[in-house]
Amino acid sequence: MIKVGIVGGTGYTGVELLRLLAQHPQARVEVITSRSEAGVKVADMYPNLRGHYDDLQFSVPDAQRLGACDVVFFATPHGVAHALAGELLDAGTRVIDLSADFRLADAEEWARWYGQPHGAPALLDEAVYGLPEVNREKIRQARLIAVPGCYPTATQLGLIPLLEAGLADASRLIADCKSGVSGAGRGAKVGSLFCEAGESMMAYAVKGHRHLPEISQGLRRASGGDVGLTFVPHLTPMIRGIHATLYAHVADRSVDLQALFEKRYADEPFVDVMPAGSHPETRSVRGANVCRIAVHRPQGGDLVVVLSVIDNLVKGASGQALQNMNILFGLDERLGLSHAALLP
């Protein structure tokens, strides 16, 4: 049984991690931390978890207790894992970080986007970017895993087949992405209030979103060179979900794009390439660790449109983190993650 610790268990990704781990036959949550809720039972804060964690309580972070775990997940704001990851790694504990702390390979670039110096630059060389569809073999040997963000997951999975094959003009990529409000976190913000977000949709961070360098980094690795990416995120009046509409110029009109995508993801348990002509819906992935993709070439032209949908809290965060844990410990990748999406 894998002994699990969770740092930061009161946000949406933390409680989603608890929900998924409750169904995992080979993992047990030993420690969950929250400074503000120390002493509160998990089941009292989240009644959906009653019967699963009736005795588990939030506690103040304690390096010794966390270091006794086999793996520790960080479901925290950026900067927290910087301070604790090194000590846990020294104790022999594997670290899976759901924050952005170790996603970017360049410490200076991280500092520019997150407005503070990187707190653990010495760990960046060994941090493995936890996108299993790209880095599965590296994940198997990792000590420190950086779980990709939600927009980066949907965007990279949608564009990687075209870039790996050298088919797309990498200098003219567009990612037009929509997110549910849970992507903004559980903290109280005016823009997340029902009266503000309901029955409305808006673009934001058009000048530059923190996920832009992460997406670009992944696409550069796929293409083997520089990329030019325009990334525009939008906030939509739904709780969960990411819908990415991706545009790429593909001059070769003879290539069978459907076959290309099906071949690339044929052995991926959590990527579903839908039949030609499909339009994947966010509701089709709600609560599930799956990315559904459809590829189109409108009017047979050079502009290819890829539609990619995920649940931002599952494949875009906690589910992908658990998928990484399964790989890391040599388990069936689907363990605890094979449940169907919720409909309606």
Curated annotation (Swiss-Prot):
Its main location: cytoplasm. The keyword NADP applies. One of its GO terms (biological process) is L-arginine biosynthetic process. One of its GO terms (cellular component) is cytoplasm. GO terms for molecular function: N-acetyl-gamma-glutamyl-phosphate reductase activity; NAD binding; NADP+ binding. Its EC number is 1.2.1.38. It comes from the Bacteria. Keywords: Amino-acid biosynthesis, Arginine biosynthesis, Cytoplasm, NADP, Oxidoreductase. PROSITE patterns: ARGC. It catalyses: N-acetyl-L-glutamate 5-semialdehyde + phosphate + NADP(+) = N-acetyl-L-glutamyl 5-phosphate + NADPH + H(+). It is found in: Cytoplasm. The keyword Nucleotide-binding does not apply. Pathway: Amino-acid biosynthesis; L-arginine biosynthesis; N(2)-acetyl-L-ornithine from L-glutamate: step 3/4. The active site is at C150. Catalyzes the NADPH-dependent reduction of N-acetyl-5-glutamyl phosphate to yield N-acetyl-L-glutamate 5-semialdehyde. Belongs to the NAGSA dehydrogenase family. Type 1 subfamily. HAMAP family: ArgC_type1. This is N-acetyl-gamma-glutamyl-phosphate reductase.
